[in-house]
Amino acid sequence: SNGMICGPDEIGLGPKTDGIMVLSNDAKVGLPGSEYFDVKSDVIFEIGLTPNRTDAMSHIGVARDLKAALNSKGHNLKMCLPSIKDFSIDNKHLNIDVEIKSPDLCPRYSGVCISNIKVQDSPEWLKHRLLSIGINPTNNVVDVTNYVLHEIGQPLHAFDTSMIEGNKIIIKTAKEGSTFITLDENER
């Protein structure tokens, strides 16, 4: 065959769709797809972890283990972690209250309020990084939370403050048999 009809998901360029990709008339025959779509080359490592190693279920966690293994072989590697000095635990200027119903199950809940965010498509580099680890990009806000989750291993969630009833977030376990709407808009 001299060609192929495919969707963006079949060549790692987007979420699963029912349609096919139609290239513009200026697409040159023989040009590698990575050049046409400006896809950067990357190496993806698939790592199997045992359930007791949740500390290693992130990019930084894997890097920490890799550093320890290489340093034991004579290397002198150091980790450079981002500064968190601006995220003081003493900052109480949020207008949102947090109530933890079971502190034995959730001893700490923290949040940051960021204002004047324009929800839009993520930049291409972020979309490609998420797609490379099997996550479909949604928008800049959701994509940043997913990126940080995989970077540091800490689950995040973004809330629209105008949608929080009573300016209060309540952390609790679900009651037996209760249902709720998940982020994919399904009742579970």
Residue ranges and their predicted role:
Residues 1-188:
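RNA/tRNA-interacting regions in translation and RNA-turnover enzymes
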